[in-house]
Amino acid sequence: MVYDSEIQFTLDTICPWTYLAKRRLDKALAQIREDSSTPVNFTVKFKPYQLYPGASQEGEDKYAWYRKSRYGDSDEKMAKYMHLMSMYGNKEGIDFKFGGTVANTLPAHRLIQHFQEKGGPEMSNAIVNSLYRQYFEEEKHPSATETLLTAANEAGIDETEAKQFVEDENEGLQDVKMLIREQAGNGIDAVPYIVIEGKRRDITIEGAKEVEEFVKALESIIKESS
């Protein structure tokens, strides 16, 4: 009998470490799924988190914000960060860029959560992949209407339906805010934060671990579910 394991992946669409973690988890899942006899069906469910909840919708310069808020206005430290992230990104097929705008991500989370509930894991996965790529590799605004509609289109969502949802800024907003509060209540104060549901126990992974560590965790869930 196949055991259904939900992987709760808490993220913010402006967090580069969650982008790396998702790529690595995707690779690990692909390895595990190569064995068609695996007695566990893994499904990823995304949960919202905000790195910068006080950000405006208009946003501010991404490079300047990182340099000031994370690296003490040091160009040297910022250069080291960009080199490190570029190196990590290249390994996972991500072409990190550091320009663009950092802004409030509530509209992006609203899109993810609404269509995750309505369209399922494949749809939400496509939305998240698009939002990450647009923000980190194409320097797009993280929650502009154009960005959200592009993500919806790439996920196969009807254009009229997507536009209607995106433009109704209140639909699903309180639900997303409640989910964010729930995550805080669960003690989550950094992302990525990943919980792999198991038959005997859950496995929690914090941070952007390597592919091998994700594989090891998934294999443990499989072993304990057999």
Task: Describe every region a protein language model picked out.
Residues D4, R67-K68, N90, A162, ...:
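Generic signal for short, ordered secondary-structure residues
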Residues V2, P39, L106, I188-D189:
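A generic fold-level signal
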Residues R23-Y135:
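Structural alpha/beta surface segment adjacent to cysteine/selenocysteine redox centers
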Residues V2-Q8, F42:
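Extreme N-terminal starter segment of soluble prokaryotic enzymes
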Residues I7-T10, I14, K22-E34, Q113-S226:
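C-terminal cap of thioredoxin/glutaredoxin-like
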Residues W17:
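Short, cysteine/histidine-rich loop/knuckle motifs that typically chelate Zn2+
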